[in-house]
Amino acid sequence: MAKDGPRIIVKMESSAGTGFYYTTTKNRRNTQAKLELKKYDPVAKKHVVFREKKV
């Protein structure tokens, strides 16, 4: 059974088009907009922007 609460699981997908992704949680009350973080993509072997997608 899923937990009720403000935190939801989101998928951070690489903008490099490699298909690599991270999963993380975000507080939907505090962060209404989609997340954009610069993280390391091991497939592309460099830091790229990861954007939030639906799980």
Curated annotation (Swiss-Prot):
Stored Pfam families: Ribosomal_L33
GO biological process: translation
Species: Deinococcus radiodurans (strain ATCC 13939 / DSM 20539 / JCM 16871 / CCUG 27074 / LMG 4051 / NBRC 15346 / NCIMB 9279 / VKM B-1422 / R1)
GO terms of molecular function: rRNA binding; structural constituent of ribosome; tRNA binding
The name this protein goes by in its record: Large ribosomal subunit protein bL33
Keyword Ribosomal protein listed: yes
GO cellular component, one term: cytosolic large ribosomal subunit
Superkingdom of origin organism: Bacteria
Function according to Swiss-Prot or TrEMBL: Binds the 23S rRNA and the E site tRNA.
Subunit structure: Part of the 50S ribosomal subunit. Contacts protein L35.
Gene: rpmG
Entry similarity comment: Belongs to the bacterial ribosomal protein bL33 family.
NCBIfam families: PRK00595.1, rpmG_bact
Record-linked HAMAP family: Ribosomal_bL33 (MF_00294)
Keyword terms of this UniProt record: Ribonucleoprotein, Ribosomal protein, RNA-binding, rRNA-binding, tRNA-binding
